[in-house]
Amino acid sequence: MITFEKISNIWLENVSFDLQYTYQAELKNATNHLKAYFGERVCDTIKGLDVDEYIRYLSQHKNPNTGKPYSKRIFSDIIDVGCRIFDYALENELIDCRNPFYKKKRKIPKNAPKKERTPIDDIQKDLILKVYNRTQIAALIMLYCGLRRGEIIPLEWADIDFINKQIAVTKSVELINSNNYIVKPHTKNGKDRYVSIPDNIIPYLKLEKYNSNGCQYIYSQKCGKIHTASSWKSSWKSYQTLLNYRYYSDLMKQQEKTPKPYNAPTGIPVLVEPFTAHQLRHTYCTMLYLAGVDLKTASKLMGHSDVKITLDIYTHLDEKYKRLNIDKFNNYIAKDTTNQIFDIQNQKVV
């Protein structure tokens, strides 16, 4: 009689030894969620009904890692890992029962929050363009060239072709432990690409190169070394704080008030929502869509492994902007019905 905890530990050890660190961490996180609930249970006693109750339990509690409700993505990951653990145990004849996680994804609560990809707004974009900071150049490249965080970290000045206005995206970084990256040839999907640099950020790049003092990397630590996970996180957080302060300071001056100092003990009100590196990349894709760039070209510029990924984004944007267009139409024709009275009982206009 073998417990779920023992089976899950065996499975995790055998499947994760040659996986990327980040994927290992994701599997471990999902496994820990499952062990917290099923850990001491004998695997043969866990039924589909128990999994249903577990899903219901999660829907009624918050994720201890985030303090927020479990998202559809987390539900899906947990159920998928549970299914894989039981499949592994059955395949190796460690247990003799049906897989209780089979087809349980259909049980994911419909009201579970779904993490939406959202582009940055015009205020955030304006701040990126006008507020100088060492992190600004990274934000500009991700926003206007669509590079991933893992592609901007190892990006070198040698990858920038100022004459042809192109960036050669030929490498990426992989996390090898909780803090350190290694540079790997090729990008996330194994495909190199060349991205055009829009005219509006050429001056920023030239100025940054002039001030780089011969540094190899376009966006590095202050010491010139490639970023670690912690140095990136710290720099990005400081950058977000600076953008918020600049907006707050400008607003106070417009109101003829004296802004608090940057490091005021009472803190600065959050007026500009922090954004992620991935949001900048998503904004780039949104701008490609709004500019009328065709699907195939957009997919190449984004470096997607499959055009279907780009299609999903374009389809979502299509639905969003079509809704906006019908709202404009409704507002336009509102004047046509201002004086109209509809008699519901007689089903006629009077």
Q: What residue spans do the PLM features occupy?
A:
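DNA breakage-rejoining catalytic core of tyrosine-based enzymes
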Residues: 2, 44, 95-97, 108-130, ...
